[in-house]
Regions:
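Secreted/periplasmic carbohydrate-active enzymes, especially glycoside hydrolases
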Residues: 1-142, 153, 157-161, 201-202, ...
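Extracellular ligand-binding/catalytic regions of CAZymes and related secreted enzymes
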Residues: 410-414, 419-421, 448-459, 464, ...
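Short, well-ordered secondary-structure micro-motifs within conserved domains or adaptor modules
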Residues: 242-265, 555-595
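Short, Gly/Ser/Thr-enriched beta-strand-loop segments that form substrate-interacting elements
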Residues: 654-691
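Substrate-binding/catalytic cleft of secreted carbohydrate-active enzymes
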Residues: 125-129, 138-417
Length: 794
């Protein structure tokens, strides 16, 4: 028996092998519901009975109403619901647009076993209730078919489910992809088995199939899926595919591993991700022609023809408390016993024992509270930016890696831990960006000088089941109302509400708040603002720098000084220190002008994505520096200083330094070291490196202050205020300990003779920041043959 609905027409369809004569529909209390029979016709594969469903309530995420149909000796639970896409604009649940707020489970790298000590059904309920508490309405099972227990819980609690049957590529002798290998029987069997679940929303063939619209067998499976489950969405693959293919009802596209801020702030509104697979019809997207009057380049827009989800969104990790996790795991293991652990495939992962050893070995124990605090703040900042930028775009939702931390691997990119317990992220805070109705602020930058204007545009992203509501919008600055607008009528979807021009009068950190109140509905959101005083240096230092704009800005001081500022690590710098002077080194990693290099890396203003990257935020320990830049933890105000800057790795620095600004590295292995070289240990040189963006050390009788920030835009408020501190107040940055000039030179010579380490493969992709996602050219340049390895990540 198969039951599906046409909710707009108020009809219920029942497909059976034999004609339906007597039947009844019962609600959850066992009470009969009147649904008169309208028709019963024979089809080639059975009988189709049409019932009047106007007495039935819809099944939805917010109201998961379930019924039972009894007919022909069978009993089938169902929900009266429909799901379809409309053009390339909307996904419609019960004929009302819905914004899909998804998270990912499934393969071992993105999931965890049953860590409840209870049944699988109870574990599913816990996971779903937690996800809904944080605002999610969809779960994708990556390359996995979920259990009946999970789908039963999803039916009852109201969560949409995206399942994947899985596929593989066949390879030739050279390791090149040849054909698709798909389990067609499993595709049909899975749809037939699960299509009656109202929670079952998306039947998908598999993960990251390139050029799916070019395969006839994919089109055949799509058509079969449409026929077998007309009230579900059929998706050929998650991640790739042509923008104009007809083999899917919804697209789920790999947007980018960029961070949607500043120069990548428009990443959700450009067509670059669609150019990887291009057109299903092999049309050229860029052409050049020449005629007598002009040479013409035409670039065709790759506009997706279906509503689109952001594939494997965010992926942002932070640093957990390993001592607390170990204690929690051990207590759980003792409680449930060995038999339960064995039945559920639960083993204590290596990182829970190896990373605490590494932390102790590297002398980082005292720093870990700061690192955890900084990485959590950084992750929350990045999550907020990503979700709000996404909601300001044309996309219809996302699927996030991930809601629950993975047990097996060390990449902690979840909102809750691998027990599905809260880990300190406030659910109400996340729902400000992760609900049917959210308020958004669009601004170019969140900082300015005193007396300058900040232009802010406030939006509503409204995907309520009944979106047309009237309410009052109140905007506050630091708790004081600056705007109140009554009788705002929301029309549904993305809607600009008001434009604000705020001439900021007071320096310091501020909070902009917005609240929309309607009958029974209140939504809020808030945003940090930084307002800086004008900054002019009194000191006129001695300069040896090549950046013209910075050199000009630093040349306007009125007080001559022997402070030496250079952008080159060379013998001249050592001579200056030997003379007992204070020198500021504006260090650029791997710059050819340097005689020597420090161990270190390039910096980007973006979070670590799984095992890509080396920035988990930072801690500003110098109070004077924190006051100058506007906070003790890295935040949006630090973007001009961090982006395209550098950082020095102090792990092997020969003496203790005064560390004023610390950068947090990730506690995660590079997967390619394991896949290519078979190295799967946690390596001290690669893990939780002691990065610094600002530190001081005595060299001989001189003071060396090393700064790795990007100072190429001194007109930016945070940069100007930091420069004023750096130049006028070097005394607050002085170090007490150090080494001789001779010892420093010898250490530099030894370090450089041994070799400056390059970033691992995945970190290198993160730091070059020039492509949305790793492409064939990148892997070739990195000398990685993907056909010969099996990754742990999807």
């Amino acid at each position: 028996m198969y039951i599906y609905s046409n909710t707009s027409a108020g009809l219920l369809f029942v497909k059976t092998e034999a004609a339906v004569s007597e039947y009844r529909i019962l609600d959850s209390r066992g009470k009969p519901v009147c649904c008169p029979k309208l028709a019963c016709v024979q089809e080639k594969d059975g009988w189709l009975t049409t019932l009047d469903a106007r007495a039935l309530e819809f099944w939805s995420v917010d109201s998961p109403v379930l019924y039972t149909l009894e007919a022909n000796g069978e009993s089938q639970r169902f929900g009266h619901m429909s799901l379809r896409s409309f053009q390339n604009k909307q996904v419609l649940l019960n004929d009302t647009h819905v914004y899909l707020l998804g998270y990912i489970r499934g393969i071992v790298a993105h999931d965890h076993p049953n860590m409840t000590g209870l049944s699988d059904y109870e574990a599913a309920r816990k996971n779903i209730l937690q996800a809904k508490k944080y605002g999610f309405n969809l779960v994708r099972f990556h390359s996995t078919i979920p259990s009946e227990d999970f789908l039963r819980a999803a039916d009852e609690l109201g969560l949409l489910v995206h399942m994947e049957i899985g596929f593989a590529y066949e390879y030739d002798d050279q390791g090149h992809k040849k054909n698709l290998s798909m389990n067609n029987d499993m595709w049909e069997k899975s749809i037939l088995q699960y299509r009656n679940h109202p929670s079952m929303a998306v039947f998908c063939i598999g993960n990251e199939m390139h050029n799916s619209g070019h395969y006839p067998q994919v089109h055949a499976l799509y058509e079969q899926g449409r026929a077998l489950a007309p009230n579900k969405l059929i998706l050929d693959n998650s991640g790739w595919g042509e923008y104009d293919r007809s083999s899917a009802d919804i697209f789920c596209q790999h947007i980018a591993y960029f961070f949607p801020y500043a120069h990548h702030g428009n990443m959700f509104n450009v067509d670059d991700p669609w150019k990887f697979n291009g057109s299903a019809y092999d049309v050229e997207l860029e052409t050049e022609t020449g005629i007598g009057a002009a040479n013409v380049t035409a670039v065709r827009e790759a506009t997706p023809i279906r509503p689109t989800l952001s594939h494997e969104a965010m992926h942002y990790i932070d640093i957990p408390d390993y001592d607390a996790l170990n204690a929690k795991f051990d207590a759980f293991a003792a409680k449930v016993g060995d038999d339960y652990l064995r039945r559920n495939g639960i083993k204590k992962p290596r990182y829970l024992t190896e990373l605490p050893k590494l932390i102790a070995r590297k002398g980082l124990t005292a720093d870990m509270p700061d690192f955890r605090r900084a990485s959590r703040s950084w992750k929350l900042m990045a999550t907020k930016v990503f979700l709000e930028k996404l909601r300001l775009s044309h996309l219809c939702g996302y699927e996030m890696l991930q809601f629950s931390d993975c047990l097996k691997y060390e990449n902690k990119n979840g909102i809750v831990d691998f027990f599905d317990d809260d880990k300190g992220i406030d659910a109400a805070w996340l729902r400000q960006m992760n609900s049917d109705l959210v308020l958004l602020a669009d601004m170019e930058v969140p900082y300015c000088y005193v007396g300058d204007k900040l232009h802010v545009e406030l939006y509503a992203s409204d995907f309520l089941p009944k979106p047309e509501i009237m309410g009052t919008l109140t905007v506050k600055l630091d708790g004081e109302a600056i705007y109140t607008g009554e009788k705002f009528v929301l029309a549904g979807g993305l809607q600009r509400l008001v434009k604000l021009d705020m001439r900021m009068q007071t320096a310091g950190n501020h909070t902009l708040e917005a609240e929309f109140v309607s009958d029974g509905i209140t939504v809020r959101n808030d945003w940090k603002l930084w307002v800086y005083p004008e900054a002019v240096c009194r000191t006129k230092p001695q300069l040896n720098i090549g950046d013209g704009a910075l050199k000009d800005w630093l040349s306007h001081g009125s007080q001559e000084s022997d402070l030496w500022i250079t952008d080159t690590l060379d013998e001249k710098l050592l001579e200056t220190l030997e003379a007992g002077k204070t020198a500021v080194l504006l260090y650029e990693h791997a710059a050819q002008r340097n005689t020597w290099q420090f161990q270190g890396a390039l910096e980007r203003f973006k979070p670590c994505i799984w095992d890509r990257g080396s920035n988990l935020g930072g801690v500003i320990r110098s109070k004077a520096t924190a006051d100058a830049v506007g906070g003790e933890l890295f935040d949006l105000n630090m973007q001009p200083l961090l982006e395209a800057g550098s950082k020095v790795n102090l792990d092997e620095f020969p003496v203790k330094t005064a560390e004023h600004v610390l950068g947090c590295d990730k506690p995660v292995r590079d997967r390619m070291k394991g896949l290519i070289n078979g190295v799967k240990d946690f390596i001290d040189q690669d893990t939780l490196r002691r990065f610094s963006h600002l530190f001081s050390v005595k060299i001989g009788d001189g003071q060396l202050i090393v700064c790795t920030f990007n100072l190429s835009r001194p007109e930016v408020p945070v940069t100007a205020n930091f420069l004023q501190l750096l130049v006028d107040h070097t005394d607050v940055l002085k170090a007490e300990s150090g080494m001789s000039v001779e010892a420093f030179r010898a250490w530099l010579e030894k370090t450089n003779a041994e070799g400056i380490r390059k970033e691992d493969v995945m970190n290198h992709f993160w730091e070059i920041d020039n492509k949305p996602v790793e492409d064939t050219l990148f892997w070739e340049e990195a000398q990685v043959n993907l056909a010969q390895m099996k990754s742990t990540e999807g």
